[in-house]
Amino acid sequence: MAAKSSVSSWRSEMSSNPHRWMMTSPGAPMVRAEFEIGELSADQVVVAVAGCGVCHTDLGYYYDSVRTNHALPLALGHEISGRVVQAGANAAQWLGRAVIVPAVMPCGTCELCTSGHGTICRDQVMPGNDIQGGFASHVVVPARGLCPVDEARLAAAGLQLADVSVVADAVTTPYQAVLQAGVEPGDVAVVIGVGGVGGYAVQIANAFGASVVAIDVDPAKLEMMSKHGAALTLNAREISGRDLKKAIEAHAKANGLRLTRWKIFECSGTGAGQTSAYGLLTHGATLAVVGFTMDKVEVRLSNLMAFHARALGNWGCLPEYYPAALDLVLDKKIDLASFIERHPLDQIGEVFAAAHAHKLTRRAILTP
């Protein structure tokens, strides 16, 4: 049992009665429920939520019966920004600060954490999966790994605190993927699926100095990416298979870029996208699997051997990378504002339905 501690509060009390929107069973209407914060451990904080992004993962829990680690009822939501309003004895330095809550919070002490593999820590905590999530007025989370937000820089970038909630997954997940793949100036980076996470992958790879190829089946998304870092856009409905690879080779040749060691990011989370990504392997290529699907694909695994290529999985992002990812946003190397839209939290049912039906063109952020 966690040790109890003295608790410090910011401005002495909560601004509203804490409440959450609870998922009671897959597909059932979410229910607003008030709750008591309870006593904090020494290392916990209470964050008054400014915004919480709606992610494909949330839709999977709600519509597809993907199992959560925490028993239902549960508040979903893992893309959280807000302000620390209560803090345990060991976390008092966070009181009053604007923060982003990491989507995955490793324990920091196990063998996986100490060897740099914290995102797969077996004792990790994920809001909206392991603990109550951010579709709420307040969340109780470990202080470890919180990412501070410089509010002066935030204002200078023309953003609100709610806006940077999506940094917690939509931005940091592709940031770690780009970092892990070793993208550097002069690389050819190919991003398959440029909605949500993939759209930010394009911007991040471009910020790292790569010539970015964006592939999707949606002309509107491709047009958007042509204005946000993509040097070449390809519609997979019009060009497929070997022709995709030939088009990228032609782009590389025309711009004096390498025909080898491409960095390929599969962000569509579809079987077709994964098959296309594998088909783009070149000598020394790196294939980063960022999107998730239950679809099965059939590939010739020996191509990895023949091309001396590598395939990498990418789960979340280490909390220590969050400040650098946030810097890209605050330095305006990543355009956040054009890809998000805010909705009141009490419209959660309508927003989930619209996101599930692919009626939203931007990532939704729910604000209490």
From Swiss-Prot:
Pathway recorded for this protein: Aromatic compound metabolism; benzoyl-CoA degradation
GO biological process, one term: benzoyl-CoA catabolic process
Any GO molecular function: alcohol dehydrogenase (NAD+) activity
Keyword Hydrolase appears in the UniProt entry: no
EC number: 1.1.1.368
pH dependence: Optimum pH is 7.2-7.4.
GO terms under cellular component: cytoplasm
Alphabetical UniProt keywords: Metal-binding, NAD, Oxidoreductase, Zinc
Leader sequence segment: none
Binding site for Zn(2+) 1: C55, H78, D169
Entry binding sites for NAD(+): 56-60, 173, 196-197, 216-217, 221, 290-292, 308-310, 314-316, 363
Catalytic reaction list: 6-hydroxycyclohex-1-ene-1-carbonyl-CoA + NAD(+) = 6-oxocyclohex-1-ene-1-carbonyl-CoA + NADH + H(+)
Binding site for Zn(2+) 2: C107, C110, C113, C121
Necessary cofactors: Zn(2+)
Cofactor: how bound: Binds 2 Zn(2+) ions per subunit. One of the Zn(2+) is essential for catalytic activity while the other has a structural function.
Function: Involved in the central benzoyl-CoA catabolism. Catalyzes the oxidation of 6-hydroxycyclohex-1-ene-1-carbonyl-CoA to 6-oxocyclohex-1-ene-1-carbonyl-CoA. It is specific to NAD and is also able to oxidize 2-hydroxycyclohexane-1-carbonyl-CoA.
Subunit structure: Homodimer.
Recorded family membership: Belongs to the zinc-containing alcohol dehydrogenase family.
Protein's name in the database: 6-hydroxycyclohex-1-ene-1-carbonyl-CoA dehydrogenase
Native source species: Thauera aromatica
